[in-house]
């Protein structure tokens, strides 16, 4: 798994990353970016994390596609916070001419009456790849939710 990830990161000369036992963590390139992590949970089970959002995959190819997409400007993370505490993360992808929702992860917030603040985080580390094949594979299972 690490070899395949390093092949992707070779195309990202500005990427700062750390290797762990079974994971690779790419740091946000700017204060407006988000961390991207790919982790092998066990054989044929992978998790990809963007900030507070995550998804499990049972194919390395799909996990690598999601990991790579998070490094591009065709993906953004919508982060909702209350009193400076993030509680909902939505992954959106660019489907010209609109941003489309892929999926959302959330935690409970006891700050019920606090106003919600939305921020959009985006990376631009892997700009010159053809993202359409990745989008087709990653979005197809979620079409009913889009």
Where are these regions (language model features)?
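Amphipathic alpha-helical segments
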Residues: 1-13
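Short, solvent-exposed coil/turn segments at beta-strand boundaries
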Residues: 31, 40-46, 71-74, 96
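Short, hydrophobic/proline-enriched secondary-structure or compact coil segments at domain edges
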Residues: 46-50, 91
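A short, exposed loop/beta-hairpin motif centered on an aromatic-Gly-Thr core
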Residues: 49-59
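A short, charged, amphipathic alpha-helix used as a generic interaction element across diverse proteins
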Residues: 59-71
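Acidic, proline/glycine-rich low-complexity IDRs
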Residues: 72-146
